[in-house]
Amino acid sequence: MATMQISAKGLAPLRPRVSSRRVVKPVASGGGKTDITKVGLNSIEDPVVKQNLMGKSRFMNKKDWKDASGRKGKGYGVYRYEDKYGANVDGYSPIYTPDLWTESGDSYTLGTKGLIAWAGLVLVLLAVGVNLIISTSQLGA
């Protein structure tokens, strides 16, 4: 059993805490400028939707634009470093990329592996349910 030394006031003396965890510091790799034309949004015809998905605005790059509350913009655009790095996170990793979909992008088919996975999931859930019913009732006694 470990013993603790008691100081004059009845509390254990303070010692520096030693941690065995490593501190990991992320370092940016400087990947260069993102090419906005290769992210899968070229087939979108509506320019407003296309700019929204790319994280751009045709108005915010101008000095005289005003936001919804009436404050004057600074002319940096949506992403201040767009000219330097190419795109914001919306540009290099957009949520909706129809160019990268399959030929039948409007429909989703599971295929054989998907059906087997769903059947396995249903069987596992049924087995768990039957086990719970039997273990909590008089049927298991």
Swiss-Prot record:
Keywords from the UniProt entry: Chloroplast, Membrane, Phosphoprotein, Photosynthesis, Photosystem II, Plastid, Thylakoid, Transit peptide, Transmembrane, Transmembrane helix
Protein name: Photosystem II protein PSBR, chloroplastic
Chain positions with Phosphoserine modification: S43
Transit peptide: 1-27
Task of the protein: Associated with the oxygen-evolving complex of photosystem II (PSII). Is required for the stable binding of LHCSR3 to PSII-LHCII supercomplexes and is essential for efficient energy-dependent quenching and the integrity of the PSII-LHCII-LHCSR3 supercomplex under continuous high light.
Top-level taxonomy: Eukaryota, Viridiplantae, Chlorophyta, core chlorophytes, Chlorophyceae
Membrane topology type: Single-pass membrane protein
Spans through the membrane: 114-134
Residues recorded with modification Phosphothreonine: T34, T37
PANTHER family recorded: PHOTOSYSTEM II 10 KDA POLYPEPTIDE, CHLOROPLASTIC
Gene: PSBR
GO BP terms in the entry: photosynthesis
Main localisation: plastid
Localization annotation: Plastid, Chloroplast thylakoid membrane
Pfam short name (any one): PsbR
GO cellular component: chloroplast thylakoid membrane; photosystem II oxygen evolving complex
Similarity field: Belongs to the psbR family.
Organism in which the protein naturally occurs: Chlamydomonas reinhardtii (Chlamydomonas smithii)
